[in-house]
Amino acid sequence: MDLGIPEFTCDVSLEDGKKPQPLQFSFTLYDLDGHGKITKDDIAGIVSTIYESIGKSVVVPHYGSKTINVRLTVSPDGKTKQTASAVKKAAITPRRRYRPRKLISDDDGSDTSENCPRVMRTRANTVVANTTINNNVKHKDNNVAKDEDVVDGLTKSSEAVETTFHNNLNGKGKTLNVKNDNIYESINNLKCCNIQAAQASKPTVALSQSPGTLNNSTATTVICRDCSLEGCTIDETLPLGTVVIPATTPAAAISSRAKRKVVRKSRSSRKASKLTDDFSRPRARSLSVGNENCYENMIGTTQEECWKSSLCRRELIEIIRDSMVKNSLCFQPNRKPLENSPKHRHRSHTIAARIGAEHCGETVMATQQALVAAHETNLCGYDSYLHQTICAAANANHAALHLNGGVVGNGGVFTALPLTTSTPNRLLQHHSHHAHAKAKRKEHRLAVATRSQVHHQVAQPVKLSTAVLNQQYPNLSAEQKLSRSINQVEKWLDNRSPKLVNKLKLAEEIAEKSPRVAAAKLKRSKSKEEITHKSTKFENVLTTDLLLDNLKITEDIAELSVVTPKKIFNKECLISSATKKNIRTHHTTKTVSTTTAVVPPAVDKASKNLIQLQYASVPINAELSECENLIRISDAEEELHQSVQQQQGTHQQQQQPQSSVSSPTHHHHHHAGASLLGENSGSSASAASTTAVHRYVHEHIHHHYHHFENDPDES
């Protein structure tokens, strides 16, 4: 039984929590199609009209929204009983990022905001004449099914209702006098509802909601068919304005949908019920590590829980810094050595036994101690990473100063440390390293020039060249030679220097006793025996020691003149150590027999010493690695060599004219150099050659070496 009602009057009351006077709206709906139903287009027109009137003053938070709850009371004109009703309900959506929202611009229900989430589902029930509620059950069921279909296609643009900020709107009927008008308070009451237990004979009445119940709630007024009026009977003479939704007999078809809606709305209401009215503040972009949805404008328990689950950036930095300090961790970039990693010394940066007058140890140490003290005050700030990166080398220098300070106090060796701190900039380290090496070379040149002007024998600084180190450790491999510790070298210097001083004093006494003759200019000598006068065994030993010391000076100059790369040098060391035994096997009496003494008889011991000093001050452009085979001998082998020379002195003088006549001059030079190479490589060391021999070997080294290996017995 359909009732043809052409007009409906809808009165809407909007209440704002901050405004005492509610907004009153009155709508008249016309049933133009003759179906007697309120459609979604009608509801959309009502909602859009309400929003256009209040929407301009609403500030919408970007993460959520409020819901307008509008209750429509529709009654025919002149009727005193409730004849028709319509309920519009709006649900809150989950939180989303801010999107600009499109509004409904027309009243005919056209959907113009497709990008907005669907917020409100409106269900319009059948307008029936409700004089007898249980009449026409079949007709009502059909209408309810149609209305459910209408709900699914309801306008998405009703999100405009969401955007009312503080306006939790409660529809008030003009004549609401119901006993239990606060039965339906919030969405939380629906948790106890058992929708599946709906009974067809038990209708449900949605009553008016008090103004304060939804003031801070985003829950919508969802109609519960089962528990809203339990124990209450329906008054047949309900006053006009009461919303009545008749129950349906086949409730199982609707219960599943309603249950899903209830769960969805209750979940959103729990989240939104914790929000306060302070939504007008803009969101501060959080730098926390924790929850992405942690907003600064959330206060109370919600904000406390959110901040408990996240870490502020400042707190995170503090935790990381404390952990690094506790574990002594520091980020080391690639190819950068650690503090306690073994440091390899450069070959050319060796240690002198005595500190010259140019060095001022106390000044250097005082400057470095002041530098270390400045770093110990942690001038680089609170950051532990910067402190460990910049100030680590200063602490290492401080420890090295304590070590070297004790050695200097005992008269030992002092190594001048560079005054630059270790910074992450490798260019600074590289520059300071080479500047320090250049200054050291310049000081050494000045010292050599000063020694060359002095005509009496003085104690020379002992150069720790590779030959001297090989003399102490002849069986070490090339890698072991690279990692010799400085302590072993200093210990060797302390044991070595007193012996040399005693020998030099004896040499000075012998030189003073012998008659002084004007120094004659010698020819270019080819061997050590042309300078050494074989008078007694004691003099030969002293002269050999002097040659050893002067040869070390020559090595200093050779190192300053030619800088040998480390890889080439190691290769040459390996070659020389590998071929040393073969050269020794070839070195027998024939090698010694080719060398002669052609010293003019007028030259005495003092003049020979003077000439040696002059030769020693001349720079030699020869690679140290090539001449290393000439300077490898021990003191015991040297004394044995001198005794062999005395025994075969007469035999050498007899064989020399024959060899010189039988061979051309250039060929004789080759054999003399080759025999000398074999002698000083197999049985010699850092003590067996003069500066002239270095010159000669530099000119013919490769030819002599291969010639000697091919025909070692040729004389």
Swiss-Prot record:
* Required for nuclear localization and inhibition of Wnt signaling: annotated span: 305-334
The question of whether Membrane is a record keyword is answered with yes
Q: Which domain of life is it from?
A: Eukaryota
* InterPro entries from the UniProt entry: EF-hand-dom_pair, EF_hand_dom, Nkd-like
Q: Where do Basic residues bias regions lie?
A: 257-273
GO biological process terms, semicolon-separated: negative regulation of canonical Wnt signaling pathway; neuroblast fate specification; Wnt signaling pathway
What are the GO cellular component annotations? cytoplasm; nucleus; plasma membrane
In Gene Ontology terms, what is one molecular function of this protein?
calcium ion binding
| Statement: the UniProt record of this protein carries the keyword Nucleus | yes
The places in or outside the cell where this protein is found are: Cell membrane; Cytoplasm; Nucleus
Renumbered to this chain, region (Disordered) spans 256-282, 639-690
Domain EF-hand, chain residue ranges per copy:
18-53
- Sequence ranges of Low complexity compositional bias: 642-664, 673-690
Alphabetic keyword roster: Cell membrane, Cytoplasm, Developmental protein, Membrane, Metal-binding, Nucleus, Wnt signaling pathway
Q: Which family does it belong to?
A: Belongs to the NKD family.
| PANTHER family assigned | PROTEIN NAKED CUTICLE (PTHR22611:SF9)
Function of the protein:
Cell autonomous antagonist of the canonical Wnt signaling pathway. May activate a second Wnt signaling pathway that controls planar cell polarity. Required for neuroblast specification.
- What is the recorded name of this protein? Protein naked cuticle homolog
Recorded name of the encoding gene: nkd
